From Swiss-Prot:
Domain of life according to the entry: Eukaryota
Residue numbers spanned by region Disordered: 466-542
Organism encoding this protein: Malassezia furfur
Coiled-coil annotated residue ranges, if any: none
Name recorded for this polypeptide: Secreted triacylglycerol lipase LIP3
Family statement: Belongs to the AB hydrolase superfamily. Lipase family. Class Lip subfamily.
Gene that specifies this protein: LIP3
Signal peptide: 1-25
Reaction equation(s) it catalyzes: a triacylglycerol + H2O = a diacylglycerol + a fatty acid + H(+); a monoacylglycerol + H2O = glycerol + a fatty acid + H(+); a diacylglycerol + H2O = a monoacylglycerol + a fatty acid + H(+)
Major location (coarse): secreted
Induction: Constitutively expressed regardless of pH conditions or exposure time.
Length: 542
């Protein structure tokens, strides 16, 4: 019996490899578009400085025009250190009647090693239905929720010019510098004191999580009011191991290739001369010439860490140079990089792609280092990786509205909850906001995008502030705030699960199990359902 997650990958992978339609040359690919290449002297600019700017017709799946204003900015940034010049592009969507004091930056789960899979290219209108490179395209449809609020949306190509997937620190720099660039754009005209929120799910959680940790030292001037992270892939080695041999084994290969692309000087010779077999090198070439769904189709259930692809069938963690970098890129291990603004994290206990342990470990580590976090575990067994994202959209929206409104977030402490409900269809949570979700359909069919719609007018007629929550009620979500350092079953330390073996990548030495308690009702749910050890664990929910 296939899980809905696997069906999603199967269907979209088949669609991706069918030559149904193409852009017919109407929009040049990024590697053939001069806009993607910086002018001479760009290295001397400051991070966030705009190098090129253009107005575009934004669209979904190539053919469904967005009825709003959109710009693309080529801007100066940095790669994996704060002093290593790089550059990338961001796409900025400005709805009608926009509130220029609100900016939501979304890190798309690109999950690819090819520049032609970049979100910026997926935003372009070609006039032809395009079903390839669907990974960033499907999430773009969700941006309507933010745009209907009147918020400006900023979507950077966080993998940069080398398409360095999962490179962590590099992506964090590019996310923060995309905010700077958006604020610097005179054409867009953002308020210089605009409130900023960063959001990222799955592959997008990596650059977004690193942006959260880097912000206080790298971009302290930005008026960040919150970060939203879901399905957080916070431990690179655990992710590589967990996915290997599963239906989405391609993501393990893509992640390894991304590490090499992001840390070329440190890892390229090692991988090219000592790690990859000839078949492995062919797989790397394929990764550099395909988007994620094609890759999933081609490498389904393949064991990457095997003699077929790696000399001697070794594991990535067997190489100290690799383990050193993945340890460095594990969120929560360095006290220098801790979020200093409120963070909302949510994760499915039965996530078949990104194991729950790593996200929980990071939340606990950050909490113990003074972060302000709410970590929500979804315990319903029907909630897989993608469904968890979709069904938590009301909570994401509620969180963002509250942050923009300046509300306190658990008194600056930490909160660890679990729940089993389907939040999207819980009327006590969603209420009339279901009507607003229906607006997405109209938006994609060409309706003028922005808060000047029937719901907006109805709120005004009822003397409601359309920019306040007022409708969503977080029933079943309230529980006692947990402060780092408290003892007993309610302390963050009791919630952590550290696994030994290959998947731990040497980041943890203590093996334990944990029960995540729903504090509002007192019930307990055993989260220790997956073993993070061994290859092929990602198939556990299929």
């Amino acid at each position: 019996m296939y899980s809905t997650g696997l069906v999603r990958w199967l269907v979209l992978a088949v669609v991706a490899v069918l030559p149904l339609v193409s852009a017919l040359g109407l929009v040049p690919y990024p590697d053939q578009d001069p806009f993607y290449y910086p002018p001479s002297g760009w290295q001397n600019k400051k991070p966030g400085d705009i190098l090129r700017s253009r107005k575009i017709q934004a669209a979904s799946v190539g053919a469904l025009k967005f009825n709003l204003n959109a710009w693309q900015l080529l801007y100066r940034s940095n790669s994996n250190t704060a002093h290593t010049p790089s550059y990338t592009i961001t796409t900025v969507l400005v709805p009608h009647n926009a509130n220029k004091k609100r900016l939501v930056t979304v890190s798309s789960p690109e999950n690819s090693n090819w520049i032609r899979c970049a979100p910026s290219y997926a935003f372009r209108y070609s006039g032809v239905l395009e079903l390839t490179n669907f990974e960033p395209r499907w999430e773009q449809m969700l941006y309507m929720l933010y745009l209907e609020e009147g918020w400006v949306v900023n979507a950077p190509d966080h993998e940069g010019p080398n398409s360095a997937n999962a490179a962590g620190i590099s992506g964090g720099h590019m996310v923060l510098d995309s905010m700077r660039a958006t604020l610097n754009s005179k054409e867009i005209g953002m308020d210089k004191d605009a409130k900023l929120i960063g959001h990222g799910y799955s592959g997008g959680s990596i650059p977004n999580g690193w942006a959260a940790g880097l912000q206080s030292s790298y971009a302290p001037e930005l008026n960040i009011v919150g970060w939203s992270l879901g399905g957080t892939a916070s431990d690179p080695m655990m992710t590589l191991d967990f996915l290997d041999g599963s239906a989405t084994a391609a993501l393990s290969l893509i992640g390894a290739v991304g590490l090499v692309d992001g840390y070329h000087d440190e890892l390229y010779d090692l991988f090219n001369n000592q790690i990859w077999t000839d078949e492995g090198k062919r797989a790397v070439w394929t990764a550099h010439h395909a988007c994620v769904y094609e890759m999933v189709f081609l490498f389904m259930n393949q064991v990457i860490q095997s003699p077929k692809y790696i000399k001697g069938g070794k594991n990535f963690s067997d190489y100290p140079q690799v383990a050193k970098i993945t340890n460095k890129l594990t969120m929560g291990t360095n006290p220098k990089y801790v979020p200093r603004k409120p963070v909302f994290m949510f994760h499915a206990a039965y996530d078949e792609e990104i194991v729950w342990y790593q996200a929980n470990n990071t939340a606990v580590a950050w909490c113990e280092q003074g972060a302000n976090i709410r970590f929500l575990t979804e315990t319903n067994k029907a909630l897989n990786h993608v469904v968890t994202y979709l069904l938590n959209l009301p909570y994401i929206m509620e969180y963002m509205r509250d942050r923009f409104a300046g509300k306190s977030y658990y008194n600056g402490g930490c909160q660890f909850d679990s729940m089993s409900e389907y939040p999207l269809f819980d009327t006590s949570v969603l209420g009339d906001r279901f009507k607003e979700i229906l607006q997405i359909t109209l938006d994609l069919l060409g309706k003028e995008i922005g808060p000047n719609d029937s719901i907006y007018r109805a709120k005004l007629a009822n003397h409601q502030n359309p920019n306040k929550v007022g409708i969503i009620h977080p029933s079943g979500m309230k529980s006692t705030t947990i402060t780092p350092g408290e003892g007993g079953n309610d302390s963050p330390a009791s919630k952590i699960v550290r696994k030994t073996g290959k998947a731990s990548s040497g980041n943890s030495s203590t093996e334990s199990t944990s029960k995540n308690q729903t504090q509002s009702g007192g019930d307990t749910t055993n989260i220790d359902q997956y073993s993070a050890d061994g290859k092929g664990a990602g198939q556990g929910n299929n």
